[in-house]
Amino acid sequence: MMNDNNERKPLRTIKGRVISNKMQKTVTVLVERQIKHALYGKYIKRSTKIHAHDADDLCNEGDVVLMTEVAPISKTKNWRVVEIVARSD
């Protein structure tokens, strides 16, 4: 059944640290998360590298950025940098 009012799901946003800005209009962002081990209950760090679109080339290595999910921009990019939360030192 279709919903009459055009409600959209809220876009996913994630925070990560820029580890590379060598590409044009693209940054590589490291996103870390913690998962709980199924048997032992210990929390383990896991990380994912994501390519994100940075239209104005404002991000530098070490910056903490907020990204949102968008329609695919290229083969590997479907995230866009929304905001630079913290600049690198």
UniProtKB/Swiss-Prot annotation:
Keywords: Ribonucleoprotein, Ribosomal protein, RNA-binding, rRNA-binding. GO terms for molecular function: rRNA binding; structural constituent of ribosome. Gene3D superfamilies: Nucleic acid-binding proteins. One of its GO terms (cellular component) is cytosolic small ribosomal subunit. It comes from the Bacteria. Pfam families: Ribosomal_S17. Belongs to the universal ribosomal protein uS17 family. Part of the 30S ribosomal subunit. One of the primary rRNA binding proteins, it binds specifically to the 5'-end of 16S ribosomal RNA. This is Small ribosomal subunit protein uS17. It comes from Xylella fastidiosa (strain M12). The gene is rpsQ.
